[in-house]
Amino acid sequence: MERIFKTVDDSRAETVYLVRPTHLNGANRLFGGILMQWIDEVAGIVAKRHCGGNVTTASVDNLTFLHGAYQNDMVVIKGKLTWVGSSSMEVCVDTYVESPKGERHRINNAHFMMVALDENDKPMHVPGLKLQTDDEHLAWQHGEERRRIRMQRLKDKLDGI
């Protein structure tokens, strides 16, 4: 069977949350765990759009908190595919605080490894990724390097057992 290919734009996702008092930690900033849930959901949406089935989060790389978000801030979360394997997909998620004037500044970045699952919760093949821009090709190369590092870390952990 010939592999189907989809573009990065086919699966992009963006969502907006308003930070409410129940989302705040003791320092009156957005609780990191809440943001992690939100970005995991966006990564899942991107991956589901690409593979057309269920997905699970396998790992999160480089989860970086750059700045805080506060009550009444609009938090914009954008996700896109950067790399795909046979059953796994890397999703880059960027998070911004948006001002009432529409200006955005990034507060978080993360890379999620998502795995497509069939009806028996076993990994299933995913469509390939058709790269259309120089930025997409560069993101793919960076995704390949992150994958190589993940595989080396896994090998090192297994060797230590």
Model-flagged regions — what are they?
Residues 1-161:
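Terminal targeting signals and extreme-terminal segments of soluble enzymes
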